[in-house]
Amino acid sequence: MQRQHDGLRAALVAEGVEIVDVGGSLGDVKAVFTRDQAIAVDGGAVICRMGPVGADPGYGRRGEEAYITKVIANLGMPILRTINGTGLIEGGSFCFLTPKVAALGMSFRQNEEGARQLEDVLRASGTRLIRVPLTGHALHIDGAILMVDHRTALVNMARLPYWFLDELKALGIQLVYVWPSEGHAVNCLAVRPGRVIISEGCPRTRERLTAAGVESIEIDYSEIRKNGGGIHCSTLPLVRDRDGGRGTV
């Protein structure tokens, strides 16, 4: 796992990305999935409230919020809201579709109170939030859709309701469908518009991305995928250049 995580880090640096380490003595190996801990929006960050609570000390993800809060505060990035009370949200289930339209995948890791608190923050910048019920035991929306360019999305249609696919088309978003046996391909990372880092083992999906004008960089992430997440899960973009170039994760 460490070797593959180091490989992701090297790929990000090669793309001009500035990396900030969370650090801390996190006890759960799933803490590598920093995407879930916070959400970057216009003007600052929203600190999430994690779903899993460990029965024993050092197990479960509740508590990771404290580490990411310290990191973001030390960077001088405004914290606009901390999801509190009974609210639940994990960042892997949030995505921007356009600058003013976002989606939140609803599952047992997200609830209506969490969605309401996030919506309060987004409303201040004129951003609409679409609640998308996820299928079965799916946890996060990043296993179903990823924006790979300004108006192009990689999607796993088996994990999204039909009406939401129609909504994407109404927003003018071109849909690139993952190859049915390569569902993990969705959990990739756009490092700039039209360029993604993707897991090995997705040749047919990569062909479809290429046909849509999207470049892909392939890395081995198989061991970390066994831990229940992917490349997208392992990164938390904080700032992206307006020109689509370098960013900070």
Language model region names:
Residues 1-249:
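The feature marks the mature, well-folded catalytic cores of soluble enzymes
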